[in-house]
UniProtKB/Swiss-Prot annotation:
It comes from Treponema pallidum (strain Nichols). Residues 254-447 form the HDOD domain. InterPro entries: HDOD, RNase_Y/CdgJ. Signal peptide: none annotated. This is Uncharacterized protein TP_0073. It comes from the Bacteria. It holds the Pfam family HDOD.
């Protein structure tokens, strides 16, 4: 049997006619979401044919932009299969309710499934209308991370044990088949139309050379998630990291941190140094003294009496706080500019640092509080560097690409925020910045791959950045990962807006103090 006919036979019965108005894919918004590694979310209640096509077009656009067009047909089929199953699961809830059956009761489930397919198809518009009225949705999210494309299909119904078992059985059966023809000859399930489609999906993933564990089924109390984590080309990841390191090595016009600050840094790291020695070194740098006193007298320290003594100021901020101040001042001096774009980037960096500190304080975690500001401040170091060296850096990029025969889409990755993170991390290593700072720069767009010990810190900076984008109208609430909202106990859009506005007001007050 031809593959296209198989797909049509499975899906056409649950598709509504295409609407007259076609939904247009916004390529630039998708490109920006990829750069920021934000999830692209699409929600539908009835999954009409035009929406199914639109979801497929969004997926194809993403795959084109990340240089993997060869998997488009396979993955769009998988997404279509999972969304159809999710919609069908919602329909099933309405059908069972109308029949007075308990879908979680094994006997009722068996009884209802005998007639579900035929009767629901005869009156599908009725059931879809009720689904929408009751708020039963299908949500598709697609998120491009540095290592993978994460696709989730979510419906807000808890899967029953019987449904879970049937899906598991189909997965086990799919392992027995070497191809589609063999599967078609053995699997025909009249009650569960999703069975054959799931087997086809598993065989398609196998054909792509993927392990079956790229597909996961997650059952929560109020929703069911079908998740696919499709690896990006490993070679591309390696090339991106190497290219970023090469760029950092070739930035000749970016000097090391100022020698006086490095001298103070070495003194702090010396276990035999006296506090008076550190104070003496700081006293030789008027600008550093100014920044130190400004810091210790700022609202974040909450002191009732102003401090004007350098020795007392060092005691109050502590050696760790002093180190972070050195990195902040040093980076600012090296990369300072009157250029509007770079000034804007630094202003955004200061804002992110302040928001990260505010979020950290809410957790009460002292280690998190100590590192959050400096990591928030320097998280976009790569973007600042890239802007400062452009267009010279673009010339160097092109030279390196030609020398190493690197594909064009790897260069596109470097030009994106993801590439900026690699460049920033490489530069931070050149400056011998501490590991928390280096890891925050490298992974703030790639939380799943962040080292476990730094995840709370990196999550704080990433959430601070997203909170600012949300407040500025650049990132919708729906695009903020649920894991981050949960970590900071944000339960609604209004709660996030209130938090963001409070942090913004405090930030503005400190700027004018």
């Amino acid at each position: 049997m031809h593959f296209a006919r198989v797909v049509k036979s499975i899906h056409s019965v649950y598709s509504l006619p295409m609407c007259d108005t076609q939904i247009v894919v916004d390529t630039e918004k998708i490109r920006k979401a990829i750069e920021l590694q934000l999830p692209i979310a699409i929600t539908t209640y009835t999954l009409p044919r035009d929406m199914d096509i639109y979801i497929g077009q969004v997926a194809k656009t993403i795959l084109d932009l990340i240089g993997q067009p060869h998997v488009k047909d396979y993955l769009t089929y998988c997404i279509s299969e999972l969304t159809t199953n999710a919609k069908k699961a919602n329909t099933k809830r309405i059908y069972f309710r109308e029949k007075g059956l308990d879908i979680f009761d094994p006997q009722d489930y068996k009884r209802g499934m005998k007639s579900f397919k035929e009767e629901s198809l005869e009156n599908i518009n009725h059931y879809l209308k009720l689904q929408q009225q009751e708020g039963l949705y299908v949500k598709v999210t697609m998120q491009v991370l540095s290592h993978a494309l994460v696709i989730e299909v979510i419906n807000n119904c808890k899967m029953t044990p019987m449904e879970f078992k049937r899906v598991f059985d189909k997965r086990v059966r799919a392992r027995r088949y070497s191809g589609l023809e063999e599967a078609l000859a053995h699997i025909l399930d009249n009650s569960e139309g999703a069975g054959l489609g799931l087997v086809i999906m598993m065989l398609m993933l196998k054909k792509l050379g993927l392990e079956e564990d790229v597909y996961r089924l997650v059952v929560e109390e109020d929703r069911t998630i079908s998740r696919m984590v499709v690896p990006r080309n490993i070679e591309i990841q390696t090339q991106t990291t190497k290219l970023a390191a090469s760029i950092a090595d070739r930035i000749d016009d970016i000097p090391q941190l100022p020698s006086k600050l490095l001298e103070i840094q070495r003194a702090i790291e010396n276990p035999d140094v006296q506090l008076s020695d550190i104070v003496a070194l700081i006293s030789q740098d008027v600008a550093l003294v100014t920044d130190l006193l400004k810091l210790v007298n700022s609202a974040r320290f909450g002191m009732n009496k102003r401090c004007l003594d350098i020795s007392e100021a060092v005691k109050r901020v502590g050696l760790r706080g002093l180190q972070n101040l050195l990195y902040s001042v040093g980076a600012g001096r090296v990369l300072q500019s009157t250029d509007d774009e770079r000034k804007q980037l630094w202003n955004q960096a200061y804002r992110t640092g302040y928001f990260a500190l505010g979020l950290a304080k809410a957790t009460g975690d002292q280690a998190l509080i100590a590192d959050s500001y400096i990591c928030g401040l320097l998280h976009n170091l790569g973007e600042v560097v890239f802007t400062s060296a452009y267009p010279e850096m673009l010339i160097k990029l092109t030279e390196i690409q030609a020398e190493r025969n690197i594909p064009p889409h790897v260069l596109d990755t470097i030009m994106s925020d993801v590439g900026h993170a690699e460049i920033g991390a490489a530069l931070a290593q050149r400056w011998n910045l501490p590991e928390p700072v280096i890891n925050t720069i490298r992974f703030h767009h790639n939380l799943p791959h962040a080292p476990e010990e730094y995840k709370p810190l990196i999550s704080t900076v990433a959430f601070a950045n997203m909170t600012i984008r949300f407040l500025d109208g650049e990132t919708p609430y729906e695009q903020i990962p649920r894991s981050l909202l949960s970590f900071f106990r944000i339960q609604s859009e209004q709660q996030l807006r209130t938090t963001a506005q409070t942090l913004q007001s405090s930030f503005e007050a400190e700027q004018t103090a």
